[in-house]
Structures are given as structure tokens and as C-alpha cells.
UniProtKB/Swiss-Prot annotation:
Kelch repeats lie at residues 595-641, 699-754, 945-993, 994-1040. Residues 31-1169 are extracellular. It is found in: Cell membrane. The chain crosses the membrane at residues 1170-1190. The gene is L1. This is Polarized growth protein L1. Keywords: Cell cycle, Cell division, Cell membrane, Glycoprotein, Kelch repeat, Membrane, Repeat, Signal, Transmembrane, Transmembrane helix.
């Protein structure tokens, strides 16, 4: 049965962590992977460096052939790179179900098979091929028609036993390949074969769904098993005609209610005394088995000899017939006779069954004046129903009773046959989701008798009509009795023609019941377009059973088979005793040592429920402990003394072993759970190697099937997975529960084969990366080699409005709603002895204290990586896109943010106290406008101003579009000017007096993409030539030390990506656009130093590379998430993927964040360690301090000497004489008490006043109306109100207002005031 794994898994690729220590023990492989040159990046001057984006796994580009492109959603031939990542060697258009290795001509080969119709672009009819493990080349093993389920490589005999659902030579469902196809003695089985194994004694054991041996799906030789081929639907032509009215139309003999009748309008006559031909061209292919010719006797005319030519091959068919003169069987080919004057048909039987879509009857001899015919009928021993109803049996063409037919709903069009067998119907559907009832085709065959039938549906390949990109899944429902139906989900993504068996069993045709097959779109698909095709359905009447066989058969090679003694085999007898009788399903047979295990869906009163065993030499089968398992077993894997079992079971037959959910192990005749199993069905068990312990490779078990979680057990919580998990036997635990540096893998493994002395090969569909990391990863440079490391937090994707609900990720691309999932930005916060990593975007996770965290998470490396973050305070569908931390440890987080804090609305921006671990009491008033988004936050150096930019119109009630300033000291919004509007994508400070603003901007009347802003005078200056860039700037980074040069990237109006460098001299230098393929989206750029210089370029220094992030399409390579530009070429750097809706798709990077963003200020020369820099700075400070003290002492000594000062006497005759004048307690008692500060001393020297405005001095000096107590050296200037903000420094002195009066201290007076006054004033003003 052609059953795609994907048809069982409506959801698909899952994701799981796999241990990454492969590099310590490289694989030995005959298949060579070439390592690519190192990028030689020197990231030491950036400190810690990490990436943010929308991905589930990420890898460094290390080996040729390594790509970000996801494997076929159907099947892939897999090996592994030396770093352990799975490598796609070739792809198939459906599943690889079986593999084994065979040595052919002293070279190891892998035979692999399944339900595929092609490998790459090569057709593989029958679904089987041969792989050369040295060079990866594939050779199709032609000769089968159908699908293969299982293989067994007999290495001693140099041959392969093949089982499945197919025809080959004169066999069905089982055959041998040994340098070509060879039939088994018994010609196969009458049903599908699912498993083949060799028992300890050397006999071959077949398991499957069969009840007899022989060519089982050959049609039964019965009149009731034949079908008339509708010749009347063909395009009919002829050479020569008699010219007699009513006798010239060759079509009249193709469809008649009575073919023996003749005359005008019912007979076709050739020209007198001349040969000719009659030809029929069909829109479909067929394999005729019988021909009926009705000769004419009009006016003594008639056809004497003819030949039947099959087209397009042109072969003359060999036929047999009964000679009416003697009743004996005779044969003919080029000169087949028709009797003269015959009133009935002459029957001919084709000796060979040959496919054709056209034929020609060549008439060479005639009776009387010329040849002619009354009728012609063609039959086949197969019952088809075609979607194109013209190809079905026609009314009034000789057939009686129920006829085959088809009906349809929806908008279907007839498509040419292309490379297929026949024309077919096609419909293209739109919608999200696409409704299953949008279109359907119902096939109704001509079933004349009850019996066992094989029902197969044919699907034309997608390469012929070019629809491979839009094909999907269909639901096929076979109604095989009153109220009885069978459903199957089938993929139509096959490259070449295929057929799938949708039912095998009894059909009751009594009472006029007509079975049907309905094809419609499967549910859960969309958006469109979805292309659905419908071609034909076949009903094949099967032979009766042969022998006492029930899904299990033992074959003894080299011995002649005696069908009368089949029951002498213990294995055959054991199968025959299983229930249901004649319907037992054997899915897997496995041999190890002296034991043979048989598993499937069956039962028996002796305890053989769904699994049992044979011991070599035993006379009876052995039931396994606890009466087997309670439901179907799908797969077995034997590893030494341990048998692993996967299936749909939940317990033993006795129900007394808990935790056997879908997967279990049999050890020393005892059932053991794998944890507590999974919550679904396990279909495949595949071992592979991992270094779970450093440098100690061990076997782990990949578990694939249909499940979405691993069950809780022994304190290990239930974990969401997607159809894939890995069991680690040495730890008796699932890999995701173990704390390892991990590799990412999504998809499934279905089968494997080992090459002696080489690597293990796999079949499945796998996307893997060197690191499992959801949305963010850190880049390290240890031991002179780059590596990736995940942050110690497990981020889960969430969709809008579904906070905390894990779901598959969606791409975050320019122009899309940012409420989609992913990590958009991050921040390393290391100032003030902090060691925090802040990640922000749209996701959910769980904190250290088990609290729910959404969209912003904080990992505190200074507190054992404690995980905290934003909980439910803000709307869960918010998305953060920008972060910044100020010097007082306040986090600014912006994006598309909404919610309420302390019952106050916030929008676009929130502030969070990282010290107190709570939102600040005072939040910035909400930003306002349509689609409010903050894209950039940039605190001004050496200032209390935080610049916030993005898409908004006002901040609170203040009008400041696109860019606004939040002052952290006054807690208020300020506008940089009223002339700016548009959307800002980035802010970049060059110094505390210059900033670059990029995006899609308008300043005054100037439309541009990049502005320079000077906060000292609030002036915007357009960068020369920026208005001529192809489109808005999405990313900008500095290109030189003084910031006069920079890189800018974005997308033009036509969607084409651009990258240009501004050289600081009003000149733009574009990068060749041919380097970027269609669909490139550059979202971030960063200059990085290299340790080895590359070729010089006008665009970039030879010791630098430019890192591009986003989704980068490199021509002739594919998509990457990050690439390096060296001035000439793009080199792949990072490859990222993500899981989505059952598939794995390209991931993307949105930004880079580093510990030390000031790249150019640190890049020159060799870089010292931080501790060395601190010590050097301290030493310099001490030296300077010492020199200043010495200079001060010398200066004072010189001044005193110049004025004639001399040292005072140093004698102290009475040291205690003045103690009584001022007791010590009065002198020292006030030292611990704060010094009383007179509030009237409000002025200080010019240095204290410069830069102060009135509110600042008011706040610092606590002014009160005590001006009458002011020192005599102050001047009262005038009285005025002081509510306005005005400078406190003017050209001749400092001034402030106290009690409504403005006072001024002239500089001259300031220089003459006493030291005490100055001292008191400093204390007052600095408070």
C-alpha cells in the first residue's frame, strides 16, 4: 500500500535537541565532505556577540554542500557531516521506507526503496534504487510497477529480497534482485508484504497482508472481471472508403447496440479492391486482453485478413483464436483471418499484454469487391473508472447493466496527459483554509461480482504539468459496502506517475450495489493556490487464497515449494492460527540470535496479542510476557538483548505495566517503559550515535511517529515535541530532559543501513543544525575556532492573542505585522557590575520561579542565570523591537507595545528598573498615532536624554513625530524639532553631539533616507545623496573611526535589496546588486575585523568584513541567514531554519547585539585584557595625582618665598594651656552630626553655575524667601516671577531667584568673597 508518512502526519516536522559533541570523534566516511575555509573573524573587540531572529536551529557554514534549504517534505537520503549535522545527499518525492547494504563488485552499495517515483529528477518506477556510497550517485532499478515496503540484503547470496505492493516479471509483491530481477519460486503473494527477515536457520520470513502465494493481484480470468474499452471516445480515422452513401463513416462500427447488424449507417466499407486501415487514437492508455471483430457480408464484401498494430510502439500483436473450421486454437500476427459470411464475432486473445494508447487495424485481403467491418470491440482484464467521463464505458455500446462512470463538483479542467497514462482533471483552489468540499470527483466502477478486490488510485506526476510547488494532500474515501467506507490521506507531490492502494478486501456487489471512491482536498491546507488532480481508479479482482496462509510465510531457499505442505512450517501454522482469520496484519519481523519476533495487529487465545516470538528449533510459537501488548505494534528494533517496540499500544495485554504508551522495551522477558512513552503512535525506531558523555559515542534511539508530547515521569515534566523524540538508554531518559550542549533536529528518521567500515546512512526527512536555539544564539571564538552557544532559556513561539500557548513560528519580514513570533533584539548589560542578557520580541517562556514570561526575558548571569522578565503586566500580543539601558540601571523597551501599568495606559515604550526588578513608578506617557511602533532607542552619551524613534505622531500630548526625547531627570518628553516626520528604522550616535537617523524620512520639505542630527542646536542635516538611495534604509552601521563613513542597506521599490557605502565625501559606493538573489531581505549589518587580511577593495578595508543578516539569497547557493561581504563576494556564514505548520522552512536573523558596540574605538592594534586596562588607568591616575601634588607644593613654596613668609616658631611650652577655652566635646561633638547649612547662601563660583537653569538651582538649593539674610556682597537686581525656565548664567555673573526676587552674583564679587562664604555656598548648592 502506497502510504506516505506525511499522510499519517497532518502536522509534520518536529523538533528536538540532540547532543553536539560529534566533532570530538569525526566519522570515518568513504563519502567525503570538504571543509570550507575559516572566515578568520576576530570578534574579541566586540566582547560577547549574539544574534536575534526567527529560527529554531542555527549552524555555522562549515562544509561544502551544507545549506539552509530544508529537505524534501517527503523523503531524503541522509548521511552526516563530520560535525554531526545531517547531510542531504539526494531527495525523493515520497518516503524512503527501507534500506540495506550490499557489496557489489567489491564496492559497498546501499539499496533503498519506498513509495517514491523519482530520486532528484531521475524517474524510479517501482520505488527502488541503488546508491554508490563512494560518490553518492544513484541508479534506478527499473522493472517494478508499484511501491516497495521492505528489503532484506542477503550478503552471502549477493542478492536482495524485495517486498511491497508491486508487479514485476510474473511476480507480485515479492521478488529478488541479483544483478537484475529474478522471480521467487512461488511468484509472490496475493497481498502486500511489509517486512522480510532471515531466521537463525537461514530461512526467509515474509510478513504482511496476504492469504495466499502466487501472482496475487493478477486479474481473475472471468467474463465478470473484464471491461469494455470505450472505443467510441477515441479519435477514429480510416484510409480509403467505398464512397457508397451510408458506408463511409468509420465511427459507426465503434459503438452499436447490436454489433452483428449491418447496412447503411451501421457498416464501414473500404474502397473497392484496395487495402486500407481503421485507426483509433485515445486520450488514455490501456492494456487490452481481448478483441472482437464483426465482419460484414454486404453484397458479398468482407475482410479476409488483417493485423492489429499497437501504437505508438508500432508492434504487431500476436493473438490466438479458435479456428471455426476445426474448433482448435490457432495463432496469428500479420495475417489474422476473418471468416466470410460470419454473422457473429470472431474472438481473438492477445498472447502478450501490451500497453498502448492507440491502435490500427490494417486490412490486407478481402472478399468480393472489397473489405469492410460491421463492428469492433476491445476488452481489458481490469476495471477502471476515469475522472474524464468520456473515457468510461459508453451507453448503448454493447455493455449491459451498471457502467463505470465519474461525476464531479467544483471547477475542473481537462489537462493533457503530458508524460502520464491519460488525460486527467485539474482544479486550482484558493482559501485559508481551503474547504474540503470546494471540489470533488466521485469514481464509480463497473463491478459485476462480489469478491476480494484491490482498489488503487492513480496520480499523474507533477513534473509534467509543472505544479509541484502547489500540489498538496487529498482525502480519498472508498465506499465498499452499504454503510462501510475506508479513508486515506494521500500526497499528490509525486514527480512522476504513481498509484496508491486505498483498499484491499471484500466488496459485496450483490443487490446492485455499486462501490465508489471520492477524491477531495484534505482538510487543514491553505492558503492557496492548491492544485488537485484526479485521473483514474482501478478495481482488481484478486485470486482465491492458496494454502493456509495468514500474513506470515516461511521460505526455504533452494528447496522446491510444495503448496500442499505449507502447513508443515511452524511459522506458517502460527500465522494461520491468528485472529482475525485471513485478515491478520504482520507489520514487522525481526531476527536476533535464536529468536524471531513477529509483530502487527492480531490476537490469539494463547496470549499472542500483537506480538510473539519463535525460538530456533521450537515446535510452537511463544507468547511474550503479560499476554503481549493491548494494541497494534508498528515497528521493532533489536539491540543486543533488548527489543524496542513501537506502535499504538498503551499497556500490556493484561494491563499491568504502566507507562507503555506507544513505545516500550522488552528486557530479560520483562516489559519496561521508556519514561512514560508518548501521547500518540510510534511508527519508526532508528538508532544513531551521539557523544552523550564527552568523547564516548553511544547509541541512542530516534522515535518518530504521530505524537505531540513526551509524557511526564519521575519528576520529568511533560514536554511538547512534534512527532520526534530521542531516547538515551544509558541515562534511561529522553534527551531533552538531559542538560547538554545541543544540536537541533526536526523531521523524522524512518530507516537506516550501515556500511562496513564506513558511516551509517539514513532515510527520512530531516533538517538539522549544529545548535538548537529558539530565536537567539551567541557566537564564541574559543581555541581559534568559531562556535555557537545557546542561552540558558527555552523560548516558545506564540501567536497573537495566545500568550503562553506554544505554536509554530512565523517569519518576521519587512512589512508584516510585528505581532508574529521571534526574538527581535537583545542587549548585554554589563555596566555597574551587572551581567545580564536581555532578549525581546514575541515569545513566551517560564521563569526560574515558574512564572509565565512573555516577550521580554532577562537572564541574570550574576545570579546563577536566574530567569525573570515581563509577565502578564502588558498585553501578551505585544512585540518588542528595541532595547536600551541607562546608567541608572533603567531598561527602556519599545516596539509594538500596549497595556496598562498601575492602571495607566502605555503604548510603544515602557521602562523597567533592573535593580528593583519592577516597572518604574513613572512611565513615559504613551506614544500615539496609527500603527505605533518603536524601532530604535538610543540614550545620548553623557546626558539624561533618551532618544526614541519609530512610527508615531505624538508622545503624550507633545507633538514629536518619528523621534522624541525622554528626559530621565525631569521625566518628560521633549521634541528635537517640529520639522521631522516619517518612519525611523535606526538611530546611531557618533558622538554626544552627532547622531545618524535612518529610515523613510521627511525633514521640512526634504524627503530623504538618512539625516544627521545635532542635539546642541536641534538641527537636522540631510546626508548628501541619501535621497537617491533605491529605497528606505532598514539597517545602518558605522564604517570608520570618526563616523563620517557608514554602510546602509534596504530594499528598493521593486523589492530588490541594496547595500551601499557612504565615503564621507558626498559619494555613495554601491555593492553590485547581482550579488543578491531575488527575495533578499537585509535586516542588520555589522563591521567585523578579520585576523587575516583578504584581497583589498575600494569598498572595505582588507582587515574587515561586513556581516549581513536577514534572509540573504546568494546566487548559485541558496538562502542563508547571515553572510560575510569581503568587498568582492558574499560568503555564507550562518544557516538557520525553523519549524512551521508541519514543515521546516528557512529561518531569518533580524539583528546582532554585542557587548561593546563602539567597534572602531577599540579596533586599532592589539587589544589588552580588561584587567590590564584597569591597572594601567589606575597607575596613570596615581602618577598624575602625585605630579599635581608635587607641583602644588612647589608653587606654594615659591609664592610664600616671594612674599617673604617664614616658618612660624615650633615650640609648644604649654600644650594644654588653651584646652579650657574650647572643650574637646564641643570641638569634636558635632563631627557625627550633619553640618547646618544656611539656606541663604545660594550662590557659588562660576564653575558651579555654568550650565544650570533656574529649576535646577531651585531644586538643588532649596531656595526660601530669606533674601534679607543674604551676604552683603550680593546685589538685588530686580523682582520678577520665576516660573519660566531661563539661564542662570549670563555674561557677568551667576544669578537665581529666591522668594520671587532675582539675585545676581557678579564675577568680580565672586572673586572677592571670603573662603567661608564660598565653602557654605558650595555646600548649599551641591545638595
Amino acid at each position: 500500500m502506497r502510504e506516505s508518512f506525511a499522510s499519517l502526519l497532518a502536522t509534520g516536522a518536529g523538533k528536538l535537541a540532540l547532543s553536539l559533541l560529534f566533532a570530538a570523534t569525526p566519522f570515518t566516511s568513504a563519502y567525503t565532505f570538504n571543509q570550507v575555509p575559516s572566515p578568520n573573524l576576530d570578534i574579541s573587540n566586540l566582547g560577547r556577540i549574539a544574534f536575534a531572529g526567527d529560527f529554531d536551529s542555527i549552524s555555522l557554514y562549515e562544509y561544502e554542500g551544507q545549506t539552509q534549504e530544508t529537505p524534501s517534505r517527503n523523503g531524503t537520503l541522509l548521511s552526516r557531516y563530520p560535525n554531526g549535522v545531517f547531510a542531504s545527499i539526494n531527495t525523493t518525492d515520497a518516503d524512503i521506507k527501507a534500506m540495506c547494504n550490499l557489496r557489489i563488485n567489491d564496492t559497498e552499495r546501499i539499496v533503498f526503496a519506498g513509495n517514491f517515483t523519482g530520486v532528484g529528477n531521475m524517474p524510479t518506477p517501482g520505488g527502488i534504487a541503488l546508491l554508490n556510497t563512494t560518490d553518492g550517485r544513484v541508479r534506478a532499478l527499473d522493472g517494478l510497477d508499484g511501491t516497495v515496503n521492505t528489503l532484506y540484503c542477503d550478503k552471502s547470496g549477493g542478492q536482495v529480497y524485495v517486498g511491497g505492493l508491486f508487479n514485476g516479471l510474473n511476480s507480485s509483491n515479492a521478488i529478488i534482485w541479483k544483478d537484475g530481477w529474478q522471480e521467487l519460486d512461488f511468484n509472490g503473494f496475493n497481498g502486500a508484504v511489509h517486512s522480510i527477515a532471515q531466521a537463525a536457520g537461514g530461512n526467509i520470513i515474509f510478513g504482511g497482508e496476504f492469504t495466499g502465494i502466487g501472482r496475487g493481484n493478477a486479474s481473475v480470468a472471468s467474463e465478470n472481471a473484464t471491461q469494455i474499452i470505450p472505443i467510441s471516445s477515441a479519435n477514429i480515422s480510416a484510409q480509403t472508403n467505398s464512397g457508397l452513401p451510408g458506408f463511409t463513416d468509420p465511427k459507426v462500427i465503434a459503438c452499436k447496440s447490436d454489433y452483428s447488424s449491418g447496412g447503411a449507417g451501421q457498416t464501414w466499407l473500404l474502397a473497392n479492391n484496395a487495402p486500407g486501415f481503421w485507426k483509433a487514437d485515445f486520450g488514455f492508455g490501456f492494456e487490452p486482453t481481448r478483441l472482437k471483430m464483426y465482419n460484414t457480408d454486404f453484397e458479398g464484401r468482407g475482410t479476409k485478413t488483417f493485423r492489429f498494430t499497437a501504437l505508438p510502439d508500432g508492434g504487431i500483436m500476436n493473438m490466438s483464436y479458435v479456428d471455426p473450421s476445426n474448433g482448435r486454437t490457432a495463432y496469428c500476427d500479420a495475417r489474422c483471418p476473418l471468416p466470410q459470411g460470419n454473422k457473429t464475432a470472431q474472438d481473438f486473445t492477445f498472447v502478450n499484454v501490451v500497453g498502448m494508447n492507440s491502435f490500427r487495424v490494417d486490412i490486407s485481403e478481402w472478399y468480393g469487391s472489397g473489405a469492410g467491418l460491421n463492428g469492433i470491440q476491445l476488452f481489458q482484464d481490469a476495471m477502471f473508472s476515469y475522472a474524464v467521463n468520456d473515457f468510461n464505458e459508453a451507453q448503448n455500446c454493447g455493455a449491459s447493466g451498471t457502467l463505470s462512470k465519474a461525476s464531479s463538483t467544483g471547477n475542473w479542467q481537462v489537462s493533457p496527459s503530458h508524460n502520464s497514462n491519460s488525460q486527467y482533471l485539474t482544479t486550482v483552489l484558493q482559501g485559508d483554509p481551503i474547504r474540503p468540499d470546494a471540489a470533488s470527483v466521485t469514481f464509480s466502477p463497473d463491478i459485476k461480482q462480489s469478491g476480494n478486490y484491490s482498489v488503487t488510485i492513480y496520480t499523474p506526476g507533477c513534473q509534467g504539468d509543472g505544479t509541484c510547488g502547489s500540489r498538496g494532500r487529498v482525502n480519498v474515501t472508498a465506499t465498499i459496502g452499504q454503510g462501510q467506507s475506508e479513508e486515506a490521506i494521500l500526497w499528490q507531490t509525486n514527480n512522476f506517475d504513481k498509484y496508491d492502494e486505498v483498499y484491499n478486501g471484500y466488496i459485496d456487489a450483490a443487490g446492485g450495489f455499486q462501490p465508489s471512491v471520492i477524491l477531495r482536498p484534505a482538510s487543514g491546507q491553505g492558503p492557496g493556490p492548491l492544485t488537485v488532480v484526479a485521473q483514474r481508479v482501478r478495481f482488481t479482482l484478486l485470486k482465491a487464497t492458496s494454502g493456509n496462509i495468514n500474513g506470515l510465510f516461511e521460505y526455504k531457499p533452494g528447496e522446491k515449494l510444495d503448496e500442499n505442505n505449507l502447513a508443515d512450517s511452524v511459522i506458517n501454522a502460527a500465522g494461520a492460527s491468528l485472529d482475525p482469520r485471513g485478515k491478520a496484519l504482520i507489520t514487522s519481523v525481526s531476527s536476533s540470535g535464536q529468536n524471531l519476533y513477529v509483530a502487527g495487529n492480531f490476537s490469539n487465545n494463547d496470549g499472542r496479542n500483537n506480538i510473539f516470538s519463535f525460538k530456533q528449533g521450537a515446535s510452537d510459537p511463544t507468547a511474550l510476557p503479560n499476554r503481549g501488548l493491548n494494541r497494534q505494534v508498528m515497528t521493532l528494533y533489536q539491540n543486543d538483548s533488548m527489543l524496542y517496540v513501537g506502535g499504538n499500544f498503551t499497556n500490556t495485554g493484561e494491563g499491568n505495566v504502566q507507562g507503555l504508551n506507544g513505545v516500550a522495551a522488552l528486557v530479560n522477558d520483562k516489559w519496561q517503559p521508556l519514561g512514560a512513552g508518548v501521547n500518540g503512535v510510534v511508527l519508526y525506531l532508528v538508532p544513531f550515535s551521539l557523544n552523550v558523555t564527552a568523547n564516548q559515542p553511544e547509541q541512542v534511539l530516534a522515535v518518530s511517529g504521530f505524537f505531540d508530547s513526551v509524557n511526564e515521569f519521575n519528576g520529568n515534566p511533560s514536554t511538547n515535541v512534534q512527532d520526534f523524540a530521542v531516547w538515551v538508554p544509558s541515562r534511561s531518559n529522553w534527551l531533552h530532559n538531559l542538560d547538554f550542549f545541543t544540536l537541533a533536529m526536526s523531521g523524522r528518521l524512518m530507516t537506516f543501513a550501515d556500511v562496513p567500515g564506513g558511516e551509517r546512512w539514513f532515510g527520512g526527512s530531516v533538517s538539522s543544525g549544529s545548535l538548537l536555539a529558539s530565536g537567539t544564539a551567541e557566537l564564541n571564538n574559543g581555541d581559534d575556532a568559531l562556535s555557537l552557544e545557546a542561552f540558558p532559556v527555552n523560548l516558545q513561539a506564540q501567536q497573537s492573542g495566545e500568550a503562553g500557548v506554544p505554536s509554530r513560528k512565523r517569519a518576521i519580514l519587512e512589512g508584516q505585522d510585528m505581532s508574529t513570533t521571534g526574538v527581535r533584539t537583545g542587549k548585554f548589560h554589563t555596566e555597574g557590575n551587572n551581567n545580564m542578557t536581555i532578549l525581546a520580541g514575541h515569545f513566551s517562556t517560564t521563569g526560574t520561579d515558574q512564572q509565565n514570561i512573555t516577550n521580554l526575558v532577562i537572564v541574570d548571569g550574576g545570579d546563577s542565570d536566574k530567569i525573570t522578565g515581563f509577565s502578564d503586566e502588558l498585553d501578551a500580543n505585544s512585540t518588542f523591537t528595541a532595547l536600551a539601558v541607562t546608567s541608572n540601571n533603567i531598561l527602556f523597551a519599545g516596539g509594538m507595545v500596549t497595556g496598562r501599568l498601575d492602571n495607566s495606559r502605555v503604548a510603544g515604550l515602557v521602562t523597567y528598573d533592573l535593580t528593583a526588578k519592577r516597572f518604574t513608578p513613572v512611565q513615559p506617557p504613551p506614544l500615539q498615532g496609527p500603527n505605533i511602533t518603536v524601532n530604535a532607542i538610543a540614550p545620548r552619551p553623557n546626558s539624561n536624554d533618551v532618544f526614541v524613534a519609530g512610527q508615531f505622531l505624538t508622545a503624550g500630548s507633545l507633538g514629536c513625530a518619528a523621534v522624541c526625547i525622554w528626559n530621565t531627570e525631569r521625566n518628560q518628553w521633549n521634541s528635537p524639532g517640529n520639522s521631522l516626520s516619517g518612519v525611523v528604522s535606526s538611530l546611531t550616535w557618533i558622538s554626544d553631539t552627532q547622531m545618524y537617523i535612518s529610515g523613510n524620512l521627511t525633514s521640512g520639505d526634504n524627503v530623504t533616507t538618512i539625516l544627521s542630527f545635532n542635539p546642541s542646536n536641534n538641527q537636522f542635516t540631510a546626508i548628501p545623496g541619501a535621497i537617491n538611495l533605491p529605497g528606505p534604509v532598514n539597517a545602518l552601521t558605522i564604517a570608520n573611526e570618526d563616523g563620517s563613513q557608514f554602510w546602509a542597506a534596504g530594499q528598493g521599490s521593486d523589492g530588490t535589496a541594496y547595500l551601499q557605502r557612504y565615503n564621507g565625501e558626498q559619494q555613495w559606493m554601491p555593492v553590485d546588486s547581482a550579488l543578491f538573489g531575488p527575495g533578499t531581505d537585509i535586516r542588520g549589518i555589522q563591521v567585523i575585523q578579520v585576523s587575516e587580511n583578504h584581497e583589498s577593495s575600494d569598498l572595505i578595508s582588507d582587515n574587515e568584513d561586513l556581516l549581513l543578516m536577514g534572509q540573504i539569497q546568494i546566487p548559485n547557493f541558496g538562502t542563508v541567514s547571515a553572510a560575510l561581504f569581503n568587498g568582492t563576494n558574499l560568503v555564507p556564514f550562518l544557516l538557520a531554519t525553523k519549524g512551521a505548520d508541519g514543515q521546516t522552512t528557512d529561518g531569518s536573523l533580524s539583528s546582532i547585539f554585542v557587548e561593546f558596540p563602539a567597534f572602531f574605538s577599540q579596533q586599532n592594534g592589539k587589544h589588552l585584557a580588561l584587567w590590564a586596562i584597569v591597572l594601567i588607568g589606575l597607575a596613570i591616575a596615581l602618577v598624575l595625582t602625585f605630579l599635581l601634588v608635587v607641583a602644588g607644593i612647589l608653587l606654594e613654596w615659591y609664592r610664600n618665598k616671594a612674599k617673604g613668609y617664614s616658618p612660624a616658631p615650633q615650640s609648644y611650652p604649654d600644650r594644654m594651656g588653651n584646652v579650657g577655652r574650647l572643650p574637646p566635646e564641643q570641638l569634636f561633638g558635632t563631627l557625627s552630626v550633619p553640618r547646618s547649612r544656611p539656606t541663604n547662601y545660594l550662590f557659588t563660583c562660576t564653575a558651579l553655575c555654568i550650565g544650570m537653569d533656574v529649576p535646577t538651582i531651585h531644586r538643588r538649593c532649596n531656595p526660601v524667601a530669606h533674601h534679607k539674610q543674604l551676604p552683603a556682597w550680593t546685589e538685588q537686581v530686580r523682582t520678577e516671577q520665576t516660573t519660566e525656565t531661563r539661564p542662570a548664567i549670563n555674561e557677568d555673573g551667576c544669578g537665581t531667584s529666591i522668594g520671587g526676587l532675582l539675585f545676581r552674583l557678579p564675577f568680580s564679587r565672586a572673586r572677592r568673597i571670603s573662603g567661608d562664604d564660598v565653602f557654605d555656598t558650595i555646600l548649599a548648592c551641591s545638595s
